[in-house]
Amino acid sequence: MVMSSSLLEAAFAHHVWATTRLIDACLDLSDEQLETSVLGTRGPILDTLRHLVLNDTFDLFVLSGDRAFDIDDEDMTLAEARVAMAHNGIGWTEYLSRPLDQDEMVHEIDKSDGFQRWAPVGFRLAEVLDHGTDHRSQVCTAITSLGVEPPKIDVFNYGLGAGRIVEKVPNA
């Protein structure tokens, strides 16, 4: 079954926007604050953002086969993570612009340990969005624990900023 990419394009545009906004918010944090870890989350803010961006890049590589997304830089700075995420945004736009078969099986091999996975395109794409939402939420929790208000990165705020959503507050 071939999927329409239009719905996916909006979802992935939000994914890239939200991740980039969160990275931008963390650029103002000190090195000590970036090492903040909250119980129940993946780990320190910086490590979680690196993990999120690198996995996003890896998923693009697995799905597209484009070696430009075959990077592994676990020491990347936040500025480098931001650049990588912007590059991912271009990659997702290009990937989603072609006809996609949600049932096409994609084979993944982990270079570090040989782990292999076969999964349909539809599941891989859903996992990218789920993974991003989960880790952005964890970083927002850690930022909040520092007494800092995290950026508003929900879908409706994205839509408002992109001019795709209009809201009207009733008269009080």
Predicted feature residues:
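SAM-dependent methyltransferase
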Residues: 105-111
